Amino acid sequence: MSETAESGSSKEMADHEAERVFLAVVDDSDEMPIALHFACRRAEHTDGRVALFYVPAKADFQHWMAVGDLMREEAREAGEELLQRQSAEVQRKTGKVPILFIREGDRSEELIKLMDEEPNISILVLAAGTEDSGPGPIISYLLGKGARRLHVPITIVPGSMTVDEIDAIT
């Protein structure tokens, strides 16, 4: 099941056809703010716009349907709060309200579906994880099984970069 937030409708995207749209994935990772800052700086310098994408964590509790539904609703509410905080940050940095997308399902699959559905998304901006376990699940998926389905360039920002380093290159 997938869903596009009202503020991320195809109509709104069509209204901004001339704008370059930088899509950033919102999550609670340490490196996410780095990717978001990079997307904001690029949007600011190219008269573009930032779009934020969020998929709540799946509720694994299947024993009682009502409990699973409650867990999904709580995860969605937490995600909406996170999106609102990041949206305010994007607006502060770029002067433009970002486009918001909330989906349910597998995050990597929903990300590819979104990029297929929204032709105005110009670039996907991700930050690589800083842990020894690798760059992160989305990057690993997109560079592996998902690579053949991509039609949007990806910018991978090292998660260890600082805001000052990003500012210097953007």
Protein language model annotation of sequence segments:
Residues 3-4, 8, 12, 54-81, ...:
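Acidic, proline/glycine-rich short linear motifs
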Residues 12-66, 149-150:
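Small/aliphatic-rich secondary-structure junction motif
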Residues 71-99:
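Helix-adjacent hinge/juxtasegments
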Residues 145-159:
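Short, acidic/small-residue loops that bind anionic groups at enzyme active sites
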Residues 1-13, 17, 91-124, 164-170:
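Structural beta-alpha unit
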Residues 34-38, 113-114, 142:
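A short acidic, amphipathic alpha-helical/loop segment
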Residues 51-53, 99-103, 155-157:
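General small-molecule cofactor/ligand-binding pocket signal
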Residues 126-148, 163-167:
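Glycine-rich, Arg-bearing micro-motifs that act as flexible, cationic patches
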